[in-house]
Amino acid sequence: MKSAVMAVACAAAPGFRGPSAFNGAALTTSAKACSAMKMSFESEIGAQAPLGFWDPLGLLADADQERFERLRYVEVKHGRIAMLAIAGHLTQQNTRLPGMLSNSANLSFADMPNGVAALSKIPPAGLAQIFAFIGFLELAVMKNVEGSFPGDFTLGGNPFGASWDAMSEETQASKRAIELNNGRAAQMGILALMVHEELNNKPYVINDLVGASYTFN
């Protein structure tokens, strides 16, 4: 599990990319493509201070609007999942539900470790239920509203739908930008928690920096 977490960390970090061979002509062509790409997408929500338009991996090279919106859809979804993961990580560190997680395995909620270690404790049937539920949400529930912005999963009967529609376009754009930034921070945050858990079983670095003791698993 440790090697898997580290592999994900390395793959996600631009600094771990190996060098590639190129010549002057290729570099010039790449620079022109990047310049055109920046002009196309620099006004999109999320291209904001302090980094502005930032695409170090070149995922949008020669991309059209459809490609951009697909990547934005994926980014928004991953950001939301990461925010839930951060909230769950912190909640489980301090709170355990009463009762049994699995009677057949004689496993209570209080017995479950936090973080990555929990994956090895969940019974196979439990993991199957989790993945089945995720698949159900992905295929049948969380679908983007056709013709709307990437990440608009508004469903019929949503109690917040009316309040969102009542907002001005400027306020909606601001809310979407805030969500993007929070999601980006959460993706880096949950990855950091996973890596530090595997390194020394001390994921909460801020606690260590300020001298606030805690027991993890």
From Swiss-Prot:
Record InterPro entries: Chloro_AB-bd_pln, Chloroa_b-bind
Membrane topology of this protein: Multi-pass membrane protein
One example GO MF annotation: chlorophyll binding
Induction text: Levels are increased twofold when transferred from high intensity to low intensity blue or white light.
GO cellular component: chloroplast thylakoid membrane; light-harvesting complex; photosystem II
GO BP term, pick one: photosynthesis, light harvesting
Recorded superkingdom: Eukaryota
Annotated keywords: Chlorophyll, Chloroplast, Chromophore, Light-harvesting polypeptide, Membrane, Photosynthesis, Photosystem II, Plastid, Thylakoid, Transit peptide, Transmembrane, Transmembrane helix
Spans traversing the lipid bilayer: 81-101, 122-142, 183-203
Cell compartment(s), UniProt: Plastid, Chloroplast thylakoid membrane
Disulfide bonds: none
Transit peptide, UniProt annotation: 1-39
Reported function: The light-harvesting complex (LHC) functions as a light receptor, it captures and delivers excitation energy to photosystems with which it is closely associated. Energy is transferred from the carotenoid and chlorophyll C (or B) to chlorophyll A and the photosynthetic reaction centers where it is used to synthesize ATP and reducing power.
Subunit structure: The LHC complex of chromophytic algae is composed of fucoxanthin, chlorophyll A and C bound non-covalently by fucoxanthin chlorophyll proteins (FCPs). The ratio of pigments in this LHC is; fucoxanthin: chlorophyll C: chlorophyll A; (0.6-1): (0.1-0.3): (1).
Family affiliation: Belongs to the fucoxanthin chlorophyll protein family.
Name the record gives this protein: Fucoxanthin-chlorophyll a-c binding protein B, chloroplastic
Taxonomic source organism: Macrocystis pyrifera (Giant kelp)
Lineage, top ranks: Eukaryota, Sar, Stramenopiles, Ochrophyta, PX clade
